[in-house]
């Protein structure tokens, strides 16, 4: 019985499998076919999208590559032209000490205070000082160090030209009247491996020293710095060939920068040049500045004294109304007489002028000194007497217990006037 039951189970499983293997209905087949078609469409869309992305990436890559090729083409349009070459050149870094010492203002003040009697003596001293300063201002070109030795080349770099024609010379490209739009820069290269490269701008100054050898000086914005370029002969080279190469060099630099000549006779020493540009005029043609300052100061002093005399004449000529004749100011009159008697007028006119100015100043101080209403000798008579200069300002009478205090104050003021 147990076996029959197991067999029946196996048979039932086989029957179910056979039933599953039976053909499906038309509806189910249509449904499955639709599913399959949808899956195929999705796959096709995904493949198309991937293809589109690949195409866009390729297009971007192609665009970047085309841009790179375009930039490369622009770089190719930048060309280098050699204008001049020579094989043996020596370059020295030179220094020109230029000292223009201006006299200090303190010296000018001291010189202005010298009197007219000492002008001749002091002028000789100052003249010698200016000669010593001029001797110190001699200009010497000192080569300090060797910068490079080897070949020299002047080349030109042209950028921004769309079409560079072979029949156009490089100088025509650098000219302003050129029909091509672009940028041209000239360079000076010195040394075997281009040890020194310097741009040759239109305002660069190159000067030739006419004399023994072929020397050229390149000046910079700093007037104390120079480059000395000397052309040396090559091996088995004649003098005429060297002169021809030098002429070609001058022809090139005269077209691209400022070129000039100077003579060796105008220099000082063997390695000293360019003194014409900084040479000071001779001392014999120029009067010493210190003597001029002294003379001008003396004239100005005389004019100032006359002007002061004119301004202070009213103090000397005006009569002092309350002066020293007053009985109440007897002490002041005595001091005034002593002051006038103490002055001794020397023969020197400058001292006389100074004394007259001092007198006028003292008279002005006496007039502006405060005059108190409290009298010293006669209080009842002079109680209402006031100074004419201060008549517009009313004075307040002091009480009698302050008389001693005012007397002491007035004595101090009188003693102060006596010290003058």
Curated annotation (Swiss-Prot):
Keyword Ligase: no
Phosphoserine: residues carrying this PTM: 273
Biased composition (Low complexity): 30-39
GO BP annotation list: peroxisome inheritance
Biased composition (Acidic residues): 295-309
Pfam families: Inp1
Domain of life: Eukaryota
UniProt membrane topology term: Peripheral membrane protein
GO CC, one annotated term: extrinsic component of intraperoxisomal membrane
Keyword terms of this UniProt record: Membrane, Peroxisome, Phosphoprotein
Comp. bias intervals (Basic and acidic residues): 1-10
Other comments on record: Present with 639 molecules/cell in log phase SD medium.
Subunit architecture: Interacts with PEX25, PEX30 and VPS1.
Protein name: Inheritance of peroxisomes protein 1
Organism from which the protein derives: Saccharomyces cerevisiae (strain ATCC 204508 / S288c) (Baker's yeast)
